[in-house]
Amino acid sequence: MPARVHAILVVRPDGRTPAAHHLRRTLAALGEQTRRVDALTIVACGDDPGVAAVAAASGAESVITAPASTTFAAATAMATLRVRGDAVWLLAQDTAPEPEALARLVGALELGPSVAFVAPKLVRWDDRTSIVSLGVSMTGFGRTIELADDELDQGQHDAREDVLGSDVRGVLARTDAWRSLGGLDRSLSGADEGLDLGVRARLSGARVLLVPTALVAVAGDGVAGLPAPLTAPRRRRRAFASRTAQLHRRLVYASPVAVFFLWLAILPIAVWRTILQLVRKQPGFVMPEWQAALAALVRLPSVARARTRIRTSRAASWAQITPLRVSQRDLREQLDDDADSIDPARRGDLRFFTGGGAWLVLGAIVVSIAAFPALAAWTVLGGGGLQPLVAGVAQLWAEAAYGLRASGFDTIGPADPFAAVLAVVGTLWPFDPSRALVIVWLAALPLAALGGWFAATRVTDRSVLRFAGGALWALAPTFLAALTQGRPSAVLAHLLLPWLFYAGSVAQRSWVASGAASLLFAAVIACAPSLAPALVVALVGAIVLTVVLRRGRGVARLIWIAVPGALLAAPLVWRQLRTGNAWGLLADPGLVWAGPQVAADAAGRALLAAGIPTPDLVGWAGFLPGVPTWWVPLLAAPVALLAVIAPLTQRWAAGITLLVITALGLATAFGAVGISVAFAQSFPVALWPGTGLSLAWLGAVGGALAALDAGLAPRLAAVRTVAATVAMVGVLVLAVPALTSMARGTSLLTNGPASTLPAYVAAAGREDPEVGTIILTPQNEGGVSARVVWGGSQTLNGQATILSTRTAGIPSDDEVADLTANLVTSSAEDVVGDLAADGVSFVLLAPVAAPESDLSRAFRLSAETALNQRDGLDAVGDTAKGALWRVTQDVQPRASASASVHDLSRTIGLVQLGAVLVALLLAIPTAASRREARRAPRVVGPHWREGR
């Protein structure tokens, strides 16, 4: 007697397509079956008038209404009470069987008395030649493995029959087996339901068969099975359901002894899998991972019920399903096959060596050695805005954390993010961190050439233009000015900018680029806070364009770029805003130094427009004495002209974008030169405009390359090389005075000193890093500048903008002022005792910068007399750093920060470290990410994709 088939059709209107539309096709497909169903029960989840109307007209024996939150497993359990046939057919609104499907499923079920259920081949709703699912298995650790999915159906899997499980959609099960197994497990959250049913069927002694000739089209609404991963919310929903099901099955299938330990391991495994998700460039799955872990922790009653069901129906051992599992070897072969099936690469070879990149870097090394030969023998860089770094790596990172600052009595606050950059640099040479800066200076030209060359690969694939891009970037006037003047933050910002462009321009494509760009963005902002507004504007513009042109695909990756930088700067931002000093956030980090730079007038801004940040025309004013220098700014004109032409070529979109970057850089430079937010002693110091010019130079060079790449007809190809050569020669001539400044003795760089304090103090500082020195510097106007320094030297990483930019005094300032006034006058107070109580061991009367005025000379002599007459002060003598006195009383240790400060510092550090670690994990490339990258062109926005 033919088996009676009772179909259960579950409808839930939560798909992208209206449920009624899919339901009509499914009902029509049921009506076209060569072997009709004997009964149909529809379970309508939710209130949808369209679904209700279609269901009422379907001829179903009953229509059950259920809440919208009802799962497929719960809906089938409701309908099972009405099942009277020999077999149950599980369907959803988006499962449309082909006419022969049921007949073939019933035939297979009738021919196999030991078969509990049979499963069809699932194909795409709109393409029956594409396999969605054909059999499911799992690894030894319970990971679900599709035996065939997302493949072109060529009959390659039609010989497969015995499987461990299948997708639940379209399954035809014997009614008695269905009831004895207890139906679907409601705790699986909609994933692995067919696999779990198959495992339980196998353990009961039954078999599970595939019927590859029975085709069922599915749309992936997510009513039954997992939703199609078409949108980010759906992908997160799939990840949550899959992980929840895996954890649930792991606890259900485990031996009784192992269940407790597996339950304890859920959270540690979630931590490990979080790291793996970041390494796999899937940060969107981190939250579903933790949601699934927490759900598994509290669903122990569901685990107990599921284990009871298995125990009551089990008739076979677990060893019998072992052959049906997927081995690690088979899994590797399957992954290799998936990798081989990826679309062919669209990206050509980099051609770093064959395209001249290596020769460019080698030439830059030669030029650097010739320009700065003495640096090879130096251990510490001095001059300009340079100072030594602290001697130990631990101190380097301590100075980068929230807490006591290296200046002042009890100044507690956030460190500048630049201190973290210096800590990274210093860690590269841990035995002598100051030497790391020397190495950076010596390697700056080749590093700039390398960065410029790689940045050029995002604009053009022509070797000659890439070479030109690297050369122009390494010879940028603002970069050479920073090198010869000793501006470490500006040098590092210039070295980092091309890599930010390289990664940031493709950040919307991949998490690898986004992670790398986020670290570089944070580092650039740390080195050049004045660039923050321009870079934020550029980032917001990129986000808007991505929303408009890519329908939001990749927006999360672009948003992430700003996250690490924002977290690193957050403590400083909060401090400056709380003290009403928002402008102080733009201050150049490091030593506040009033070095030569153009004035905030028309002539100065004209030089800025030519890319020149110094009034001496980057050294040309003194290079040829008596020779007019009006023509020097014109040497950069070829680059500017080519950049302006770029929007008129086929690469108009790239040209406009790069011109906008140029405009943002120039606006930053123009604004910076007229803004003073930091003070060197009592004198305001304007922001260095060179970092803005570096950004402008990046856009101008990129625009010039884009113009030469696509702005010439094929018959004029030779003109491209000529134009690139002219631009390079012009900038090279402009760079000659800077490159020869050390040989001519005009460079501000010096060999050290290893300490900014006298050798006596430096020696004491090596023994005790907390030794205190109060430094008194007479002013030419007759006053005195005073500051307290801790350790054997003032250090570059010990500088803090919260101190150099403050516009109002703090309590420790008043204390320093009182001590200074009492020290330099014949006061009767025990000021030396106060110094000792505060932890100060030395008093240094520093010389005033030449020329010394009569007022400052008189003040210095008067102060020396007063200090010599003080009891408790022992004159060490005159040194190159000034006159030094030692406190002879018992000096108390410097007051330490409170426990609450340490707790706050630890919390801030952990949050910042977490953001950096996430960015690092995202930035590490994997084999899969490299394959994905090769599918996209290296050049961003090529003309054949942009149009005109």
Residue map of PLM features:
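Short, acidic, metal-binding catalytic loop of nucleotide-sugar glycosyltransferases
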Residues: 28-37
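Conserved donor NDP-sugar-binding/catalytic core segment of glycosyltransferases
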Residues: 99-138
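Active-site-adjacent helix/loop segment of glycosyltransferases
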Residues: 203-301
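Membrane-embedded helix bundles of polyisoprenyl
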Residues: 215, 445-458, 464-548, 557-573, ...
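Active-site lumenal/periplasmic loops and adjacent helix-entry segments of GT-C-fold
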Residues: 373-506
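Membrane-helix boundary/interfacial segments in multi-pass membrane proteins
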Residues: 382-395, 402-411, 479-491, 627-631, ...
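Periplasmic/ER-lumenal interhelical loops and adjacent helix-loop junctions
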Residues: 402-405, 561-650, 755-756, 761-766, ...
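Extracytoplasmic
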Residues: 590, 732-948
